[in-house]
Amino acid sequence: MANKDHAPEHYVTRILAEATLDGARPVVRWRDTVITGTQLDRSVRRVVTALREAGVARDHAVAVLTQVNSPWMLIVRYAAHLVGASVVYITGANHGIVTHELPVATRVRMLREAGASVLVFDESNAQLAETVDETVRDKLVLCGLGHPASGTVSVDGRPVDDVSVDFTPEAPELAMVLYTSGTTGQPKGVCRSFGSWNAAALRGAAYPRPVFLTMTAVSQTVAMIVDTVLAAGGSVLLRERFDPADFLRDVGEHRVTETFMGVAQLYAILGHPDARTADLSSLRHVLYLGCPASPERLREAAALLPGVLAQSYGSTEAGRITVLRAADHERPELLATVGRAVPGVTIAIRDPETGHDLPVGEIGEVVVHGPEVMAGYVADPEHTARVIRDGWVHTGDFGSVDERGYVRLFGRMREVVKVQDTRVSPTEVEKVLVGCPGVVDACVYGHRGPDLIEELHAAVVLGTEGAPSFDTLRDHVARAMTPTHAPIRFVRWRRFPINNTGKVNRLRVREVSAEARGDSPDVLVDR
């Protein structure tokens, strides 16, 4: 363990110090609940006491099962990090527009992989916690939570009344095991080191007293932004799901200064009829990410939100990689890029077959070296060795870097579709489709029919007025690219399912679209 006399500041002590400077100040809002600085401090300290009674020590792991984006998700993590433990969230709902609960078996797998011996749960998940406990081979210590505003905690049914006041904060080796969103497959557990998490949380906010709105789960990397805001003396507004009307109302009512969303959510806001009349004047920083955005839609977004947009490209494994800053959004030629490397990150483009670095402008795999690179996949050293080689994360993304350092992405390496001997990037086709008037969002993918010939299919969300026909969409793609790039089958969705990082759940879209028929209540099919 590092010498504590020379240890860096613990981000949770900074958060609690800022929260209690004015203990009556609201610091967390959730539903109709307001948590003040004093309440946050006392709740964290009471959970510290509970975790100690449960036998939690440095480098142990704590599993958390609460309602999505409940304040308890923050409180328990802060307490666990103070006693030197890591956290794994098994709440796991792919919330957003559509909610899909994780099976018990998946929750148990996540808990076991992380090595958690303590399960902390809220009242709404008490029965599920018992089911998980009965399913796990080794008996868990169960810590129950009351309403977030009450701060009540119990250990195996015994109420915890004491509030830890004097203690020395510990620093765990791992901060969290983050499970990837599983947009295309089974979620994987990514180990994030406490050192990199702590440094990121303490880097400071861009503006004093920020008010941050999150509509994506704080079980994911948005939690790092929440920590940065609270450590800077700001406040956070936690929402359980995304709705464009709610977003517009929240920004005006709570004078939100910063927010975080997926590209699909940004598109939904642009398409809302009240977007042009809502009061968005308080916004100073709108960070969006998840996939490359259509330049046409970004021009529309920049007109609605001038001077505040920033696009981030990153991954759970690599952390932040690039940023397209607000000033970059004023230059049309840069809107097809995802920006330049963030400070401390080095990007290389390598030949996927030879591993050699490629020259400027050539397309290859994006590989990354930086301070937020994961420690590895939990309980999977072989997969870790494939993804991290000599300290470089192999992202699996096709991309290129121009002479100024701007990165352009061309889709996932394994998602390239071969149509009539032509390699087609679904991401590039999606950008063209979303650039067509009347298209809100698009998801393009490969499909093999009975003859096993690969075809290009597309799922689209269309606007309520002036929606283009499927033939119009085919012609639009054929003119902008080639006829080979035009999808032969379209499925119209009312809205796409969104996972807990704000990305479109591509696997779900493909599965439902493949089974869809013309009489489906959710989709309209054309071929």
Curated annotation (Swiss-Prot):
CDD domains, sorted: AFD_class_I (cd04433)
Cofactor: Mg(2+); Mn(2+)
Pfam families recorded: AMP-binding, AMP-binding_C
GO biological process, any: novobiocin biosynthetic process
PROSITE patterns documented for this protein: AMP_BINDING (PS00455)
Positions of transmembrane segments: none
pH note: Optimum pH is 8.0.
Recorded GO MF terms: 8-demethylnovobiocate synthase activity; acid-ammonia (or amide) ligase activity; ATP binding; CoA-ligase activity; metal ion binding
Lineage top rank: taxon: Bacteria
Residue numbers binding ATP: 180-188, 312-317, 397, 412, 503
EC number, UniProt record: 6.3.1.15
Pathway recorded for this protein: Antibiotic biosynthesis; novobiocin biosynthesis
Catalytic activity field: 3-amino-4,7-dihydroxycoumarin + 3-dimethylallyl-4-hydroxybenzoate + ATP = 8-desmethylnovobiocic acid + AMP + diphosphate
Keywords: Antibiotic biosynthesis, ATP-binding, Ligase, Magnesium, Manganese, Nucleotide-binding
SUPFAM superfamilies: Acetyl-CoA synthetase-like
Ligase found in the keyword field: yes
Subunit structure: Monomer.
Function field: Catalyzes the formation of an amide bond between 3-dimethylallyl-4-hydroxybenzoate (ring A of novobiocin) and 3-amino-4,7-dihydroxycoumarin (ring B of novobiocin) in an ATP-dependent reaction in the novobiocin biosynthesis pathway. Novobiocin is an aminocoumarin family antibiotic that targets bacterial DNA gyrases.
Membership in a protein family: Belongs to the ATP-dependent AMP-binding enzyme family.
Protein name (record): 8-demethylnovobiocic acid synthase
Organism encoding this protein: Streptomyces niveus
